[in-house]
């Protein structure tokens, strides 16, 4: 059954959107491998991409440069496609300290990591959707280029059940154990199963709301049903069901035994090399560590750091690329690279950093050379694997422009009629006093101001100066974690303060329609923060306001400033001509502040009496750090299961609604 993408929106494509949609679709149908959508801030790039996906009906992966932007895109796509599979695939580590060795101080650092269970469940849900259906959009971070379990082995491990199938209970239980599910008759949670007579309840690893009940009679599957694990209420009777492994890295027993033999051969060869070079300590260390890992694999089927042996487990040859999320994407899939000027360089950088750390581990006998093949994809491997690609950015990089050639689609005209900000260049000598008078003009009419400086020191001094002069100002810097950053931007929009000072505000990627003035101090100092691309991005922060204006403080106009001003004026002129031609009066954006943290509407979950109470309770946790929030979710889950065991289903359901909302908040801030 192949479902079709169904786009839900109260708006129709307008402005430059219709021509951008038709050009992108035309290019994809003509087989173009690379296209670039050059869309200005506020022109509805996500809506354009959503229309292309819906019209062509192809499974799509959207790559975002960080978790914050991925969460925002996921929320938007969920709203556009509520009836289709919109999935979220980012790193599931809350904390990650990779294995490393520092030769200068002879210090070995053990791997240490904390995995977030909810994000792990969403990753499993993403790969399941890609394997089962075509109406899929996976919003991913650069985590997508890191090694994942081999899709062929993953498919072989699945347990298919159908009504009327002849299979005995012990066979089902054995297969569940092979899939790394644990039996737990007391606390029924994700990736566990329980047995009651001839009834087996399984909580699938990729599900967060429904579990499977298998009812057997005389070694035959009599009935398969999906039920609410909290209340026990049957939601749906199904004819067939596929149980997926608990992890992407599950490997069949025979493959593990085969891998162990290959590891022994490689260990013997490596020992010879180390002894020949008189590296006795390294040889002893490697032998001891590898033999311990082999013993663990033999007894348990896995070991700590098993990813370092992934080459043997997936049957790859030395130097071959690891299987990644791209291997799960169908051949006719589509790749959308959002904020491509940031994302593309990130993909290229991942491999090199990983490689240098691993080479030290191999050289000093902590790992076999095969550990070097547990790595992210190299950039050229990414290029070879990537399907037809659309790069989306307001300021595309050199790579995208070269690859796209003439296939660059402009989306400069905004449907709202909003013009790009007016730009003024003013002298540096009086920049602080001039800025203060401009801020006061904006505050008087309830508008907000962004100020970007070159150094941390200057940002701190400016914040202090503005505070002394009675302005409500906050300072955004790298030491502030994601949750606090989102809160600061939310407070700016709500009017808790009027001025936000920062060094690199263009990275936020969050919409702030209340901002009417962007002030760029020391704009004439050439460099990374004052390049043409950075200036256009920063100026664009005021492009969602009717009175948008950017002031560049500089004693001369640099080449970067000239190009940024010229490009902004070109876009402004094009928008103005469109407005006059179509009789459009520019309208300010009126985006609800709650939208900043919203992560896709959670469907029909939690309707009813407990919902308001849940929302009320969630409010008291809004200032928690991601780590504290994760701990709170675990505590509430434990309480929920206790209520369910005591048959207090109303209390359990209320806690479940609260947990759902906290999880959405957690993903938005992590």
From Swiss-Prot:
A motif (Beta-hairpin) lies at residues 92-115. Transmembrane segments: none annotated. InterPro entries: Helicase/UvrB_N, Helicase_ATP-bd, Helicase_C-like, P-loop_NTPase, UVR_dom, UVR_dom_sf, UvrB, UvrB_inter. It is found in: Cytoplasm. One of its GO terms (molecular function) is ATP binding. Residues 630-665 form the UVR domain. NCBIfam families: PRK05298.1 (NF003673), uvrb (TIGR00631). The UvrABC repair system catalyzes the recognition and processing of DNA lesions. A damage recognition complex composed of 2 UvrA and 2 UvrB subunits scans DNA for abnormalities. Upon binding of the UvrA(2)B(2) complex to a putative damaged site, the DNA wraps around one UvrB monomer. DNA wrap is dependent on ATP binding by UvrB and probably causes local melting of the DNA helix, facilitating insertion of UvrB beta-hairpin between the DNA strands. Then UvrB probes one DNA strand for the presence of a lesion. The beta-hairpin motif is involved in DNA binding. Keywords: ATP-binding, Cytoplasm, DNA damage, DNA excision, DNA repair, Excision nuclease, Helicase, Hydrolase, Nucleotide-binding, SOS response. Residues 431-597 form the Helicase C-terminal domain. Forms a heterotetramer with UvrA during the search for lesions. Interacts with UvrC in an incision complex. Its main location: cytoplasm. This is UvrABC system protein B. The keyword Iron does not apply. ATP binds at residues 39-46. One of its GO terms (cellular component) is excinuclease repair complex. The lineage of its organism: Bacteria, Pseudomonadati, Pseudomonadota, Gammaproteobacteria, Enterobacterales. Coiled coil: none annotated. Residues 26-183 form the Helicase ATP-binding domain. The gene is uvrB. GO terms for biological process: nucleotide-excision repair; SOS response. The keyword Signal does not apply.
């Amino acid at each position: 059954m192949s479902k079709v993408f169904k786009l839900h929106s109260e708006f129709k494509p307008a402005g430059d959107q219709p021509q951008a949609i038709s050009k992108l679709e035309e290019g994809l149908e003509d087989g173009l491998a690379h296209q670039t959508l050059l869309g200005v801030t506020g022109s509805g790039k996500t809506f354009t991409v959503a229309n292309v996906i819906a019209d062509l009906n192809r499974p799509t992966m959207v790559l975002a440069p960080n978790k914050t932007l991925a969460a925002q895109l996921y929320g938007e796509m969920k709203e556009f496609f509520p009836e289709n599979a919109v999935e979220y695939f980012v790193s599931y580590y809350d904390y990650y300290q990779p294995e490393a060795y520092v030769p200068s101080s002879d210090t070995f650092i053990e791997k240490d990591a904390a995995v977030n269970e909810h994000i792990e469940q969403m990753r499993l849900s993403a790969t399941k959707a890609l394997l089962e259906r075509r109406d899929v959009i996976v919003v991913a971070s650069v985590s997508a280029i890191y090694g994942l379990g081999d899709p062929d082995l993953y498919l072989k491990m699945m347990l298919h059940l159908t009504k009327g199938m002849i299979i005995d209970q012990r066979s089902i239980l054995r297969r569940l154990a092979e899939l790394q599910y644990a039996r737990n008759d007391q606390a029924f949670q994700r990736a566990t199963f329980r047995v009651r007579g001839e009834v087996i309840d399984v909580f699938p690893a990729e599900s967060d709301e429904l579990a499977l009940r298998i009812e057997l009679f005389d070694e035959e599957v009599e009935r398969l049903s999906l039920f609410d694990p909290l209340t026990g209420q049957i939601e749906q009777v199904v004819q067939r069901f596929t149980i997926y492994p608990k992890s992407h890295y599950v490997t069949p027993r025979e493959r593990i035994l085969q891998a162990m033999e290959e590891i022994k051969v490689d260990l013997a060869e490596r020992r010879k090399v180390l002894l020949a070079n008189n590296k006795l300590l390294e040889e002893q260390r490697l032998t001891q560590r590898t033999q311990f890992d082999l013993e663990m694999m033999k007894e348990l089927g896995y070991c700590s750091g098993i990813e370092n042996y992934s080459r043997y487990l997936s049957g790859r040859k030395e130097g071959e690329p690891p299987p990644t999320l791209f291997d799960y994407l169908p051949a006719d899939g589509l790749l959308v690279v959002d904020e491509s000027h940031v994302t593309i360089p990130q993909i290229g950088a991942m491999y090199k950093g990983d490689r240098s750390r691993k080479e030290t581990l191999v050289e000093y006998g902590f790992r076999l050379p095969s550990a070097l093949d547990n790595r992210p994809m190299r950039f050229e491997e990414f290029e070879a694997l990537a399907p037809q690609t659309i790069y989306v950015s307001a300021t595309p990089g050199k790579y995208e422009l070269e690859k796209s050639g003439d296939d660059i689609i402009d989306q400069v005209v905004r449907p709202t009629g909003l013009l790009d900000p007016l730009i003024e260049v003013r002298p540096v000598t009086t920049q602080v006093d001039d800025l203060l008078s401009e801020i006061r003009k904006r505050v008087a009419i309830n508008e907000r101001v962004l100020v970007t400086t070159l150094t941390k020191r200057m940002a701190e001094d400016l914040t202090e100066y503005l505070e002394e002069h009675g302005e409500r100002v906050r300072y955004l810097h790298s030491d502030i974690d994601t949750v606090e950053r989102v809160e600061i931007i939310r407070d700016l929009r709500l009017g808790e303060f009027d001025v936000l000072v920062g060094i690199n505000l263009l990275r936020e990627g969050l919409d702030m329609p209340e901002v009417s003035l962007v002030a760029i101090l020391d704009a004439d100092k050439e460099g990374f923060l004052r390049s043409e691309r950075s200036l256009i991005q920063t100026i664009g922060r005021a492009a969602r306001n009717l009175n948008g204006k950017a002031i560049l403080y500089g004693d001369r106009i640099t080449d970067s400033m000239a190009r940024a001003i010229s490009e902004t004026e070109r876009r402004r002129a094009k928008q103005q001509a469109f407005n006059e031609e179509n009789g459009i009066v520019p309208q300010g954006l009126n985006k609800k502040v709650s939208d900043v943290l919203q992560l896709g509407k959670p469907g029909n979950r939690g309707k009813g009496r407990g919902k308001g109470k849940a929302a009320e309770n969630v409010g008291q946790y809004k200032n928690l750090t991601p780590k504290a929030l994760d701990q709170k979710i675990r505590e509430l889950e434990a309480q929920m299961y206790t209520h369910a065991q005591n048959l207090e289903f109303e209390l359990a359901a209320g806690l479940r609604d609260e947990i759902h909302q906290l999880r959405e908040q957690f993903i938005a801030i992590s």
